[in-house]
Amino acid sequence: ALSSAASDVYKRQITYVEHGVCDMGVVGKDTIMEMQGKFFELVDIGFGRCKFALATKKGSTFYGGFDVKTVATKYPNITRRFFEAKGMDVDIIKIEGSVELAPLLELADGIVDIVETGTTLKENGLEVIEDVCPISARLIVNMVSMKMRQQEIENFVKLVEENIDK
């Protein structure tokens, strides 16, 4: 997981690209999904691969019963859309820092967070019960720049795609 300082850099980068300060930038799909800016997402660069996942205490029955579940996350927009797509009503608590502590402190029934290896979850007695979506670094482009500098950008994108380890 990224530190909050790194996360702020990516958020600023989206803002800079969206408002034309930069033509292009590289940001994580997590930041793109959470912020939903106005830009083009052109290439999955492929590094920083991990996933968003729903995790609970081992042995919990998150999907059982009729009570509204509480979910802790750093990513409330992504979490809300995930559960809306399932037709599930959940309470979302936005937490910065160690989200995995929320179920242990009985603050939440589960968490939605970035998972790379799952080690931190296991260390805290949690398990992934559902993958939300894969994430990785993406190349984004300002919408006006794409129109004004289309050939240059397409040439650059082609170069990037030719050099991505697949």
What are these regions (language model features)?
Residues 1-6, 10:
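Single conserved hydrophobic/aromatic residue that forms the stacking wall/gate
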Residues 4, 84-95:
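A local structural motif
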Residues 6, 48-54, 134-139:
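Small-molecule pocket liners
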Residues 13-14, 101-104:
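Short, hydrophobic alpha-helical packing/hinge segments within bilobed ligand-binding/sensory domains
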Residues 13-49:
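Glycine/small-residue-rich loop that forms an oxyanion/phosphate-binding "nest" at active or ligand-binding sites
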Residues 22-27, 109-115:
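Paired acidic/hydrophobic, glycine-rich loop segments that form the ligand-binding mouth/hinge
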Residues 34-44, 119-134:
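Ligand-binding "clamshell"
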Residues 58-73, 77, 84-85, 134-166:
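Extended ligand-binding regions for polar small-molecule ligands
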